[in-house]
Regions:
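Short alpha-helical functional segments enriched in proximate histidine and acidic residues
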Residues: 20, 45, 172
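Conserved NTP/Mg2+-binding pocket subregion across the NTase superfamily
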Residues: 2-6, 12, 67-154
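Generic non-transmembrane alpha-helix signal with a bias for helix starts/N-cap capping motifs
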Residues: 14-15, 58, 264-267
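Helical scaffold of the NTase/Pol beta-like nucleotidyltransferase catalytic core
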Residues: 1-28, 269, 304-312
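Alpha-helix boundary recognition
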Residues: 22, 99-100, 275
């Protein structure tokens, strides 16, 4: 079947399915998601959508339907659940990008249009915390790529880890520019920073890898992180500046993890990086495994350090 025939088949299936669910008195709205809402479909594509229903106790939050031989994957939420989901979808997150390209097919409740419209806004606080999260993820991947090259002396597997890391670096670049990273984040970032992504992405994916090439790519990635460190890890620095005291990783994770998912293990590479770069001073902090534990342990803690090496 040619391209036009495939697209017509999917359009017919969508129209038929929407016509049915619109007649269901329990369904308030239908939102088209995924490739059919913004991209091309092919014979192996499915249709993604979200059905918003009246408040009730649902036995399933997801169903796979079929129409004209095409699978329709539908997330099912009550009106209140949908509103909470939108509110919790932090700006620049995957959920945010997924919603951003969605399209309301119909709604029987005009207030849902206003809820959906809020998705277009990218909050500065969300953006900063998303950069922090991505920066932490990037440092974790970078450490693995460095280990495979410098410790295990395997340039090819080091390149494999760098290729996995490229998507995170691309998301960083996209979010830095006030945009929302999509599934095609590498293509978005390549338009914003062509030199870096040409050298690292195309260089690793498009050719053979040797130790010298892997080392050069790692050096470029390290510089990429160094040039952006104050922007990526700004929430950590701002928090410690405000506290003016030593704070443990657990305390920082509790404070900074309210917007995006951040636990102490995720945050540790960022604080370690900032300490190595002279921005933070490390201290051990007393800790216990459980509130009832009697054995005293230690966890990493940090305090802000000024340009002269003085803690403050």
């Amino acid at each position: 079947m040619d391209r036009s025939g495939i697209e017509a088949r999917y359009a017919e299936a969508l129209e038929a399915f929407v016509r049915k669910v619109r007649d269901d008195e329990q369904v308030i709205a239908a939102i088209l998601l995924g490739s059919l809402s913004y991209d091309k479909v092919w014979e192996k594509s499915d249709i993604d959508m979200k059905l918003i229903v009246h408040d009730q106790k649902l036995t399933r939050s997801f169903m796979c339907f079929t129409e004209n031989g095409i699978a329709i994957n539908a997330g099912i939420q009550t009106r209140d659940e949908f509103k909470r989901w939108v509110e919790k979808s932090a700006s620049a997150s995957f959920e945010h990008s997924y919603l951003l390209r969605g399209k309301i097919l119909f709604t029987k409740d005009p207030s849902l249009e206003a809820v959906f419209a809020t998705i277009r806004h990218v909050g500065e606080r969300d953006r900063q915390h998303r950069l922090l999260q991505l920066g932490c993820f990037a440092l974790g991947g970078l450490a693995k790529a460095e280990k495979w090259l410098y410790v295990k002396e395997d340039a090819l597997y080091s390149a494999f880890w760098m290729i996995k890391l490229i998507d995170t670096l691309a998301q960083i670049e996209v979010v830095r520019h006030g945009e929302v990273p999509m599934r095609e984040a590498v293509q978005q970032a390549s338009a914003l920073n062509p030199a870096f992504f040409r050298d690292v992405y195309e260089g690793l994916v498009g050719g053979s890898v040797d130790p010298a090439k892997a080392r050069a790519a790692l050096d470029r990635i390290v510089r990429f992180m160094e040039e952006r460190e104050l922007e990526l890890f700004r929430p950590v620095l701002d928090y410690l500046k405000q506290e003016q005291d030593v704070r443990s990783l657990s305390e920082m994770a509790d404070k900074l993890g309210t917007v995006v998912r951040l636990d102490a293990a995720t945050l540790e590479p960022a604080c370690g990086w900032l300490a190595e770069r002279g921005h933070l001073a490390p201290f051990p902090a007393e800790a216990k495994a459980t509130p009832k534990s009697r054995v005293r342990l230690e966890e990493p803690a940090y305090m802000l350090e000024d340009a002269d090496g003085n803690v403050r």
